Design a protein with these regions (language model features):
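Flexible, glycine/charged-enriched surface loops at secondary-structure junctions
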Residues: 15, 35-43, 64-67, 87-92, ...
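Small-residue-rich helix-loop
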Residues: 67-76
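Catalytic Zn2+-binding segment of zinc metalloproteases
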Residues: 53-62
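Active-site His/Glu-centered metal-binding helix of metallohydrolases
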Residues: 46, 50-54
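Carboxylate- and glycine-rich phosphate/diphosphate-binding segment that chelates Mg2+/Mn2+
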Residues: 1-44
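Short glycine/serine- and small hydrophobic-enriched flexible loop segments
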Residues: 56, 75-83
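C-terminal charged capping/lid subdomain of soluble metabolic enzymes
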Residues: 86-167
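Alpha-helical transmembrane segments of multipass membrane proteins
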Residues: 26-30, 53, 80
Length: 167
């Protein structure tokens, strides 16, 4: 992606087909290895807890489609990984630069303000992946190495969102 990211975005490029095929192949392997989503398959949820909360907060409006919400969720989860010392700054910058290249909405402050923080957090708490009073998140140790058995208390996410939405 770092080498061919901008070329992949050109929908006429033969690289788009290769990128889609590779993505689908990876997803297929993960799903086949964990059909019931009891372990490794959870890595496919990276960014989605934030993304689904963003969509729900906006009432599933046309302001933000699912793909755009996932992009924002990926960026938010990467930032949360960085701030919790799980992901290093070099890896975070690679992710951030790649997502910024996509020329899609990538700043949560264009959609949300500090007034939305409680609502976003409320939807995160209702996420189907949670099985305790804590919020389950898939975060990144490094690119291609997600960690899926992480639980965070509401306060930690509240403080993070408050900081991110106050820019």
């Amino acid at each position: 992606l770092n080498k061919n990211g901008s070329n992949i975005l050109d929908l006429k490029s033969p690289l788009i087909e290769k990128a889609i095929f590779k993505s689908c192949s990876i997803k297929k392997k993960v799903v086949e290895a964990d059909e019931k989503e009891m372990g490794m398959r959870k890595i496919l949820n990276f960014g989605h807890t934030f993304a689904h909360a963003y969509e729900a907060t906006l009432g599933y409006s046309k302001k933000l489609n699912h793909g755009e919400a996932v992009l924002l969720g990926l960026k938010t989860a990467a930032k949360f990984s960085l701030l919790n010392k799980i992901l290093n700054i070099k890896e975070f910058k690679l992710i951030e630069n790649h997502l910024d290249e996509l020329n899609l909405p990538r700043d949560i402050n264009k959609f949300f303000s500090i007034k939305n923080e409680k609502k976003i957090l409320s939807f995160m708490k209702k996420d189907k992946k949670n099985n305790t009073k804590k919020i389950n998140l898939v975060l990144l140790k490094k690119i291609s190495f997600p960690i899926y058995k992480l639980q965070f208390n509401e306060k930690k996410i509240h403080l993070f969102l408050k900081k991110e939405l106050n820019k």
